[in-house]
């Protein structure tokens, strides 16, 4: 009854762990943007969380001005406390009827009461003979704190860097707005390159802790892989099938973290994220998540523990795994290539959530049946193994519920997300919780000298075999009463003879007087053993 009482909790954990848990942040914030712009174009918006003393550069490249024209460039740098304040800036501008034609409109109506750094560069000549436009002048409104940069900074102040138009003065979310205007009657186009490089490189302030997290997790997975390899090498003759599954999950987890770290490091160095590398990382993550769910499923079914094989059920397990991988891969790729289309990402996640719900129910039913079978067989070793696994799931449930309450209170139920530096925890926590559960599973199913005690044994254990042998031996004489009878050729068979003397005579001829003398001769003491016993007794006397 105690095991059954924990089944709803285990089902809740699987729901939390497989359905409610948010995916890893799809794309790190870039540090360099190259955007084409032409006559009649609107304003360009760049959002990013930046460290103090981050240099913002703007370059006007590849000008194409068949007719000479004078351009006016305006830019605004605005810091804000709330991370989610400008997620829909276009709607805010439309609501305030602001088109950035004047500085007052933007800084008073939209940016008030926060700090708004602004500047403009007028009368920039552009004609068909120009290959590059002159550098823009730096804003005069630069806080003094930005001048004193640390000596160990990755991006020290360089007076010869004339492309810098602004510099941040504190850590936090920033909005950079750029507008290029010219004569409305003249056609022109060019490309704008905006770069934001801080003390740690091009990576954003919200992504840098996540990059360190992936590096640490990659090292931890490497250590786990080495430990599991040493364990398996020491007891390679007695390895169970489930231990090969665990090795595969460890390898995929190590590869996943390495690819994510490589992507974040590449973004930090180059300022541009690689969609190909991100898609590869998402595919690796989908394979790992699929294999982890299959591992939990076959463990709950008792594969290798109470069943030597799953038979036709294995086809259903593989089918569910293939479906899950397809849906997980589609959802992950949609988060990368269609990150701005939230509705499409949500639509891609619906089949995945439904499939996770089905897996949750299947695991719940199978795990309950497996523990019931072990309890009926009185197999204390295997039952204790599943009990420890249950306690691990209960711990994960409590940890998940506590974190979800904290996350909802911190990020969902507030109008202003001021604690933007803790956003990386929302992505890293579920990965770390998965790592902890995997670590416990490794410990429970670790290779050892007594590895086969967790393996499948036919119906009964050794202790039950001893009881069964005793029962068979004790009742062996009862089975020897049966004798062959000759069928009658004509009519109904004769009733058995009731002559007691004939029965007794048959018993005396076919059954020894002492059953022990015939059945257990090896238990009788030999003459030599009797003599040795008497000799030992005489020595004692």
UniProtKB/Swiss-Prot annotation:
Residues 27-209, 263-293, 338-344, 406-422 are lumenal. Residues 231-241, 315-316, 366-384, 444-541 are cytoplasmic. Potential monoatomic ion channel gated by mechanical force, implicated in normal touch sensitivity through the generation of mechanically activated currents. However, a direct channel activity is debated and an alternative could be that it functions as a chaperone for an unidentified mechanosensitive ion channel. Could also be involved in cell mechanosensitivity regulating cell adhesion and migration. May also be involved in retrograde transport from endosomes to the trans-Golgi network (TGN). Residues 1-26 form the signal peptide. Disulfide bonds join 65-116, 82-416. It is found in: Cell membrane; Golgi apparatus membrane. This is Transmembrane protein 87A. GO terms for cellular component: Golgi cisterna membrane; Golgi membrane; plasma membrane. Glycans are attached at residues 52, 109, 148, 189. The chain crosses the membrane at residues 210-230, 242-262, 294-314, 317-337, 345-365, 385-405, 423-443. Pfam families: GOST_TM (PF06814), TMEM87A-B_GOLD (PF21901). InterPro entries: GOST_TM (IPR053937), GPR107/GPR108-like (IPR009637), TMEM87A/B_GOLD (IPR054101). Belongs to the LU7TM family. TMEM87 subfamily. The lineage of its organism: Eukaryota, Metazoa, Chordata, Craniata, Vertebrata. One of its GO terms (biological process) is detection of mechanical stimulus involved in sensory perception of touch. The keyword Metal-binding does not apply. It is a multi-pass membrane protein.
């Amino acid at each position: 009854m105690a095991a059954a009482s924990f089944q709803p909790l285990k089902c809740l954990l699987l729901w939390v762990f497989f359905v409610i848990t948010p995916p890893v942040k799809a794309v790190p914030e870039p540090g360099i943007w190259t955007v084409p712009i032409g006559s009649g174009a609107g304003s360009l918006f760049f959002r990013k969380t930046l460290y103090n003393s981050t240099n913002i550069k703007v370059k006007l490249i590849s000008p194409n001005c068949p007719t000479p024209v004078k351009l006016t460039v305006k830019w605004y740098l605005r810091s804000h406390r709330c991370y989610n304040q400008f997620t829909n800036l276009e709607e805010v501008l439309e609501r305030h009827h602001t088109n950035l034609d004047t500085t007052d409109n933007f800084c008073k109506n939209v940016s008030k009461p926060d700090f708004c750094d602004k500047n403009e560069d007028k009368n920039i000549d552009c004609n068909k003979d120009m290959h590059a436009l002159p550098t823009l002048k730096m804003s005069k409104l630069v806080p003094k704190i930005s001048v004193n940069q640390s000596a160990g900074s990755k991006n020290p102040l360089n007076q010869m860097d004339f492309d810098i138009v602004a510099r941040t003065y504190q850590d936090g979310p920033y909005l950079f707005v750029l507008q290029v205007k010219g004569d409305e009657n003249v056609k022109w186009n060019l490309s704008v390159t905006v770069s934001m490089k801080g003390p740690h490189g091009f990576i954003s302030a919200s992504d840098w802790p996540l990059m360190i997290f992936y590096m640490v997790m990659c090292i931890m997975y490497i250590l786990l892989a080495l430990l599991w390899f040493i364990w398996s090498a020491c007891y390679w003759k007695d390895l169970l099938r489930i231990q090969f599954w665990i090795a595969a999950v460890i390898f995929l987890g190590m590869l996943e973290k390495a690819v994510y770290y490589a992507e974040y490091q590449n973004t930090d160095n180059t300022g541009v994220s690689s969609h190909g590398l991100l898609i590869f990382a998402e595919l690796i993550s989908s394979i790992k998540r699929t294999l982890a769910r299959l591992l939990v499923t076959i463990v709950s079914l008792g594969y290798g523990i109470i069943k030597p094989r799953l038979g036709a059920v294995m086809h259903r397990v593989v089918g569910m795994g293939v479906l899950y991988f397809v849906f997980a891969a589609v959802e992950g790729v949609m988060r990368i290539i269609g990150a701005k289309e939230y509705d499409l990402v949500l639509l891609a996640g619906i089949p995945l959530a439904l499939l996770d719900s089905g897996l949750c129910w299947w695991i719940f039913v199978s795990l309950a049946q497996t523990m019931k079978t072990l309890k009926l067989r009185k197999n204390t070793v295997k039952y204790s193994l599943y009990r420890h696994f249950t306690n691990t799931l209960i711990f994960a449930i409590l940890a998940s519920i506590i974190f979800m309450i904290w996350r909802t209170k911190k990020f969902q139920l507030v109008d202003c997300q001021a604690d933007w530096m803790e956003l990386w925890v929302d992505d890293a926590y579920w990965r770390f919780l998965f790592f902890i559960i995997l670590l416990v599973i490794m410990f429970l199913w670790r290779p050892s000298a007594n590895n086969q005690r967790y393996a499948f044994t036919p119906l009964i254990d050794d202790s039950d075999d001893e009881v069964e042998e005793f029962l068979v031996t004790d009742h062996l004489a009862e089975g020897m009463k049966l004798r062959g009878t000759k069928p009658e050729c004509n009519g109904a068979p004769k009733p058995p003879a009731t002559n007691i003397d004939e029965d007794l005579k048959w018993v005396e001829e076919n059954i020894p007087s002492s059953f022990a003398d015939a059945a257990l001769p090896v238990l009788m003491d030999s003459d030599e053993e009797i003599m040795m016993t008497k000799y030992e007794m005489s020595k004692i006397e």
